[in-house]
Amino acid sequence: MIDSIVGIIQEVFSNYVILNYNNLYIKIFCNSTKFSEFLGKEKRVYVSLKFNENLSELECYGFLTREERELFLKLQKVTGVGSKLALQILSSIDFQELIVEIAKGNVAKLEKVKGIGKKTASRIILELKETLKKEFKVASTSGKEEKTYEKLEEISLALLSLGYDIDEVNQVLSSEDFSELSLEDGIKLALKKLSKI
């Protein structure tokens, strides 16, 4: 498996660059805005190789840091995301900001990315929130907020396990204040609200 490639950024296009590696020209899908700063310069690019949807071509995705690549790999594993959309997310939101917003459960921020709806944004947060908080040591603004986030996540998981739609669950959780309620009371309130949707 190839970890990284060192070469000259030969050309920059809207969503990929051409890397000159010993006169072998490699097409690398990437955040071209960041890579444009290194046009004509030698750069180490951390890569991820993957076959396209019809398995006819091996695509190369490139990043300036290992951390960005790791987040890309996590994003593409989320149901409904895939490689192209994962790259679109990383190209639309700054790396550090993206980690913080996912850890905070900010669905609205992710919805602003082209190609992402509320359902996909909610799924990204549901699947990656705790992982990113642990791996990147994202600090909450307060202990109280941290407990509220954890409580909302537990309520969300409980409701999803009962078969409720993720969009309806998020609608209810964002419309009420659950901070002062116990987990049991929070679930009861959410169920009451869901019955009216």
Curated annotation (Swiss-Prot):
ATP-binding as a keyword of this entry, yes or no, is no
Domain of life (superkingdom) = Bacteria
Q: Where is this region: Domain II?
A: 65-143
Entry's Gene Ontology BP terms: DNA recombination; DNA repair
**One annotated Gene Ontology cellular component of this protein:** Holliday junction resolvase complex
InterPro entries from the xrefs? DNA_helicase_Holl-junc_RuvA_I, Hlx-hairpin-Hlx_DNA-bd_motif, NA-bd_OB-fold, RuvA, RuvA_2-like, RuvA_C, RuvA_C_sf
What's in the keyword line of the UniProt record? Answer: Cytoplasm, DNA damage, DNA recombination, DNA repair, DNA-binding
What domain notes does the record hold?
Has three domains with a flexible linker between the domains II and III and assumes an 'L' shape. Domain III is highly mobile and contacts RuvB.
- How does this chain assemble? Homotetramer. Forms an RuvA(8)-RuvB(12)-Holliday junction (HJ) complex. HJ DNA is sandwiched between 2 RuvA tetramers; dsDNA enters through RuvA and exits via RuvB. An RuvB hexamer assembles on each DNA strand where it exits the tetramer. Each RuvB hexamer is contacted by two RuvA subunits (via domain III) on 2 adjacent RuvB subunits; this complex drives branch migration. In the full resolvosome a probable DNA-RuvA(4)-RuvB(12)-RuvC(2) complex forms which resolves the HJ.
Q: Specify the protein name.
A: Holliday junction branch migration complex subunit RuvA
